[in-house]
Structure formats: C-alpha cells, structure tokens
Amino acid sequence: MAIFDNYEVWFVIGSQHLYGPETLRQVTQHAEHVVNALNTEAKLPYKLVLKPLGTTPDEITAICRDANYDDRCAGLVVWLHTFSPAKMWINGLTMLNKPLLQFHTQFNAALPWDSIDMDFMNLNQTAHGGREFGFIGARMRQQHAVVTGHWQDKQAHERIGSWMRQAVSKQDTRHLKVCRFGDNMREVAVTDGDKVAAQIKFGFSVNTWAVGYLVQVVNSISDGDVNALVDEYESCYTMTPATQIHGEKRQNVLEAARIELGMKRFLEQGGFHAFTTTFEDLHGLKQLPGLPVQRLMQQGYGFAGEGDWKTAALLRIMKVMSTGLQGGTSFMEDYTYHFEKGNDLVLGSHMLEVCPSIAVEEKPILDVQHLGIGGKDDPARLIFNTQTGPAIVASLIDLGDRYRLLVNCIDTVKTPHSLPKLPVANALWKAQPDLPTASEAWILAGGAHHTVFSHALNLNDMRQFAEMHDIEITVIDNDTRLPAFKDALRWNEVYYGFRR
C-alpha cells in the first residue's frame, strides 16, 4: 500500500526558559541530532519531523493546534529534555486530537561520573521531566503511550515504530469509507450493529450501495482490459486445465477478471478502502466474487463477507498497521474442528475469500469449482495453504454500550494431509491455551465467527490499538483460565457501566 509518504510524526521537545538561552541552544542541538539519527538509522516506518521547542503555554498550544489541522501529522512524540512544567501543556493537550507518545529518553546513555555537575543535571532532566508530564496526562485522563530507553536502543526503535503504525492507522481510519454491496446476510446478528456509533468512535463511515450500481461498472469494462488482467493471472498463478485457454471454465475466469476490474474501479471512484459482499444479494453478477476479493485484499482493501462491515473495517485497519511488516493479514472464519486428544485443531477458511498475503511461498492455484451457495455460475478462486508460525485472530463486536475487541493468540500449523476435495484457501491452527478453553472463552465473550487473521501483527499491537481507540480488549492466550476470564468479563461490565 502506498501509505508511507502520506503521513509523518511530529517530534516535540518540552523545556522552559528557566535555564537560560545556552541550555535551550544545547537542547535544540540534541533534538536535531536525535531526530536525524532516528530517521536515518532506526528503520522507523514514518518520518519524524522536528518542531520548534515548546517552552511556553502559547508555543505548546500552537503546536498541538497545528497538529490537529495538518492531515499529514499522524501524532506527536514528546521528549521532555529538561523539566517542563506540565501546567504549560494543559491547553494544548486539551485540544490535541492526535495520538501522543512520550519518549522517555536522554541524550547521553552513560553518566559522566568524573565531570557531572549541576549544569549537566539541569540539561538532562528526563527522569523527572517525564514524570511531571505523566502526571498531567493522568490528571487529565488523557491516554498516551510511553517508551523508555536510550534513543540509540533498537528495542526503543521497534516500540516507537510499532506506535507509529498505530498512530497512522488511527489517522487513516478517520478517512476510511466502507462500501457495502447489498445488506447483511439475513437474520444474522453479529454482522449487524450501530454504524453511527462506529463512526463516532472510530471515524470510519459505512454506507450501502445496491449491487446494480456495481453491475453497471462491471459491464462497462472492456474486453481488452479483461484479457490483460487474465494475462497477469497466467503469470502469477498455477492455472488448472479447466481455467486455461480452451478450458471448459475459461469463461468463468474472464468473468472474474471483469468483476475484479469493475469492483476496483467502483471502489477507487468512491474513495472506498473496505467493502463487503453477500451471497444473498448478487443480482446482475454472474458469480460470487471470490478471486476478485482475494486480489483486492492483497492490495490492501478491507473485506468481509455477508455484509460484515465491522470486520471489513478492522481488516483494513490491521493491514495499515502491518504495512511493511513480514507476514500477511486476511479475512478469516473459524469453520470446523479436528478433535484429537492433545492435538485439537481449528480449520479456518471461508467460502472463497481468503487473502493470498498469508499463503505459503509457492504459486497459488487458480481454479473454478462449483459453489452451492448463491445460485450463480461457478466462481473462480485462489487455492493455497497458509504459512506456519505464531498468529492472531481478532474480532470487533458491538455490545450496544461499547465495542469489545477479542484477540486469540494461535499457532498456525502445517496441514497434515492433503485436502483434494476442498477447493478453497485455508489455514490450520492450534488455539491457545487449548481449543476447549479458547472456544468457550470466545463464545462467552461474544466473539464473532468472522475474524481478522494475521501473521504480521501480535497481541501487543492489538493492545495498543484498543488503548488508542479507548475500547475494551479481551485476550485469550496461554495465560487464560476460564474462571478468571469470566471474572474479568463481569468486572468489565461494571467498569464500562460506570463510564457511560
């Protein structure tokens, strides 16, 4: 996704005039050195932009106000180089609506034991300047992140980079438009929800477009464009005999390409970066979009089936969060179980729509097979197995008075047998801490059957996401025990009830 050049993060130094112009000159020099080094050596995902020193209430307020109105600014990293009285920050922080991180660092790593004097002490006061700043954040009940460590420390770099991804994701989410082609799958509860509340909370908008509008665009795609895209299919995928030239399902592949081009044109023209479909609302389309959806997800679009706009939005958000990281992120569904003593497994898939970003390295297979649901022509799809290793599945649900994010840590494993009659992409995993505990906890917490599956992101990423958006998070991992989990659900009811 071309998102790296769209955003930057501002680096703000807090100080005061108490120490005189020479100290402020040194503070500025240190700040310039640190920012230049971080931009060139720390492998941060986004550029740090140094702003003028914040030494008075008016200066700080101006920086925060400017940050709010600059669409390129994804958030603020604040370094309290000297002591910076926190009352100076109140007006600015009151109006700030961008993510905030305090980098609790100092210019020197080691103390100069033989030469340290009070001038050095006054210049390098992060140790208590950061605490003063932390107090005002706590007093104002303002959520902000804190990273402690020397500015040359790789772990600090990684944590700042992770926070940057969250900040950019939040900014991107404020501009996110979700298109629903048709409505929800009829009578399904968890895919429904309050779209107005979601826009107030997260910033993304959700609107429905009749499938007929999409069909008009699909039908306008030229044969030349279709053939060019099919040539791309030929080079990227292993085509089954039925899908090759003169194959009995070749026309289905051509139609899938036409749908993909039409969908992408519709989404681009509308400024949409997430969308849903439903097999119950396909009037005018010749097949359920399988291959088109898979390829659009791989390009960074959020998607979910059956009108599930919350999961579609979450997928787009998590794709932005994971931009540039190794591993993929996909729409997923817990489909069926393998019960075996000590080796319980979950087979995840969907009817067609699993993102190739999570596939093993070899070329996916492009095939056309019968689909009994939807009542349309046989759809094209990519078939592949998934990479192994640690992963997460996440679900965002609407509880009426709040949103709850559920995260289950999992371990993806290799499929022990071939699946010759299962013509869909799939993932096989062990749920942590075990399948009975994980499934019971998930069900008790109201988790959806649709999830976002990710090898690229981890539990810490999702904790940051929940904190930044001020929503509840419920975690199921190797530390989960059902009695304590149930207690936590009850305590959360009380806590969030008091906050209403």
Swiss-Prot record:
It holds the Pfam family AraA_N. It comes from the Bacteria. Keywords: Arabinose catabolism, Carbohydrate metabolism, Isomerase, Manganese, Metal-binding. Binds 1 Mn(2+) ion per subunit. It is an enzyme of class 5 (isomerase). One of its GO terms (biological process) is L-arabinose catabolic process to xylulose 5-phosphate. SUPFAM superfamilies: FucI/AraA C-terminal domain-like, FucI/AraA N-terminal and middle domains. GO terms for cellular component: cytosol. Pathway: Carbohydrate degradation; L-arabinose degradation via L-ribulose; D-xylulose 5-phosphate from L-arabinose (bacterial route): step 1/3. It catalyses: beta-L-arabinopyranose = L-ribulose. Mn(2+) binds at residues 306, 333, 350, 450. Catalyzes the conversion of L-arabinose to L-ribulose. Belongs to the arabinose isomerase family. Homohexamer. This is L-arabinose isomerase. It comes from Shigella flexneri. The lineage of its organism: Bacteria, Pseudomonadati, Pseudomonadota, Gammaproteobacteria, Enterobacterales.
